[in-house]
């Protein structure tokens, strides 16, 4: 009776995607297919060796912001249940680039995943468990039987209750043997997965994302300042007494540097005279459900702000986790939704009726705001005068590739940033194609820029003084392309920029 009650709670609370069999008729779990690549373990796992533990399978794809949002919940469950629970992230990749073990390895390291990861490249496990969405959680009981599944964020409480109940109901011998976990070695580089940058006549500002810090250089390559302790937390203060968490987009002004502090779900301001870091929006908590502004910006819960653009006193925010663009008025401190309903879709029209797909990059010029709409592999344009949203390049969530040509035919793959090169041209960080693409706004054509080097998931762009700066994220470096001379150089970041004990 208690087990039937458990199943009822699990079904009702989670809105399970498929009905569950009665306890007496539950089916066996599916064995992990031989030959799949594994990370964070010394050997492939089997369902047989996991018997006696509750097994939680987390089906995800690494470019999905919703999948990133649930990683802290997985960590909490691991910490609470220890060896009674086996958490396994089953990576079922959406994009072609995500199938590569090398890029998956970079992501597992970037997000500090502490449990086993298996790369389900051909969707064998996905199909076996009839999964339909990312993220989806599948529970296997200690008896090795399938219990149920649920999809989406905010499932910690119901998973916690179900795991606790499954352990209580199990009459067999518990399996407390530790799994053969061996975590990836940390990066030993000056920069670690730099995600974004901003450049003006004084500074080259870099989001040293995996080191949870901001690096300020001058144009001679001298370190001006490191900001952030390296510990992933939300903490205001001066220089290294402050703290960030996976910072991304940056905007430089005469007096300040604004930071999209993605992992903290916050917007930060760095005073460029005192180097005091303050939080100007976000309370450090991930908003669950629909985003609401809050009585003040710092009381609001945000969802993975990824990039910023500034127009006088209006700060535009690419709110990747809510599939929207928000604005923060720096004078009135008013925070509000600017474009997008919050639905994940490729819908044009009036800005508040339109829909976006994990917007990750912004570029602003005069009355136009361009959006790198990553999950739709699209570039969107918002006319700030008329309020109209238009898709320039991109055909939908599952249409992607590497194709030049007219806007209607061209294809991108999970592009994460966009900048204005001149009044006729946009440059796009075509992240999963490892390319820089150029969009001719007059001829409505897309071409690939040949820069003579192998990029690896470039995540951020900046333009200054005839040079295109590129955050070459998975190569842990910054490079610049001289637009006139067609030459590439690497920005030499001094060793003093490296954290003494990077986390």
Model-derived features: positions:
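Structural microenvironment flanking redox-active thiols in thiol-disulfide oxidoreductases
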Residues: 69-110, 121-125
């Amino acid at each position: 009776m208690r087990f039937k009650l458990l199943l009822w709670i699990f079904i009702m609370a989670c809105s399970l995607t498929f009905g569950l069999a009665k306890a007496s008729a539950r089916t066996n779990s599916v064995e992990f297919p031989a030959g799949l690549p594994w990370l964070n373990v010394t050997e492939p796992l089997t369902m047989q060796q996991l018997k006696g533990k509750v097994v939680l399978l987390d089906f995800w794809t690494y470019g999905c912001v919703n999948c990133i949002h649930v990683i802290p919940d997985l960590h909490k469950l691991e910490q609470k249940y220890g060896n009674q629970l086996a958490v396994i992230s089953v990576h079922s990749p959406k994009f072609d680039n995500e199938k590569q073990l090398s890029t998956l390895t970079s992501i597992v390291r970037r997000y500090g995943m502490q449990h086993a990861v298996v790369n389900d490249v051909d969707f064998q496990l996905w199909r076996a468990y009839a999964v339909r969405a990312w993220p989806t959680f599948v529970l296997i009981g200690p008896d090795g039987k399938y219990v149920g599944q649920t999809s989406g964020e905010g499932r910690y409480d119901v998973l916690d209750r179900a795991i606790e109940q499954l352990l209580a109901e199990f009459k067999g011998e518990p399996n407390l043997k530790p799994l053969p976990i061996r975590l990836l070695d940390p990066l030993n580089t000056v920069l670690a997965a730099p995600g974004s940058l901003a450049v003006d006549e004084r500074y080259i500002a870099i989001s040293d994302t995996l080191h949870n810090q901001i690096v300020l250089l001058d144009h001679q390559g001298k370190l001006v300042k490191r900001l952030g302790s390296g510990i992933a937390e939300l903490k205001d203060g001066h220089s290294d007494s402050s703290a960030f968490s996976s910072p991304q987009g940056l905007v430089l002004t005469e007096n300040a540097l604004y930071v999209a502090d993605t992992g903290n779900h916050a917007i930060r301001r760095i005073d460029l005279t005192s180097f005091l870091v303050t939080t100007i929006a976000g309370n450090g908590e991930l908003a669950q459900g629909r985003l609401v502004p809050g009585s003040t910006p710092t009381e609001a819960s945000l969802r993975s702000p990824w990039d910023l653009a500034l127009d006088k006193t209006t700060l535009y925010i690419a709110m990747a986790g809510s599939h929207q663009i928000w604005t923060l008025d720096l004078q009135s401190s008013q925070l509000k939704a600017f474009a997008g309903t919050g639905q994940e879709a490729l819908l044009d029209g009036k800005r508040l009726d339109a829909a976006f797909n994990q917007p990750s990059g912004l570029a602003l010029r005069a009355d136009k705001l361009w959006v790198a709409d990553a999950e739709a592999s699209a570039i969107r344009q918002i006319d700030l005068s008329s309020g109209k949203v238009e898709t320039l390049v991109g055909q939908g969530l599952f249409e992607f590739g590497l194709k030049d040509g007219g806007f209607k035919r061209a294809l991108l793959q999970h592009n994460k940033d966009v900048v204005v090169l001149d009044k006729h041209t946009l440059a796009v960080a075509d992240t999963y194609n490892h390319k820089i693409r150029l969009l001719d706004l007059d001829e409505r054509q897309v071409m690939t820029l040949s820069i003579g080097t192998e990029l690896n998931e470039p995540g951020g762009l900046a333009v200054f003084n005839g040079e295109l700066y590129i955050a070459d994220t998975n190569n842990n470096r910054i490079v610049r392309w001289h637009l006139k001379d067609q030459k590439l150089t690497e920005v030499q970041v001094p060793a003093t920029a490296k954290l003494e004990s990077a986390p």
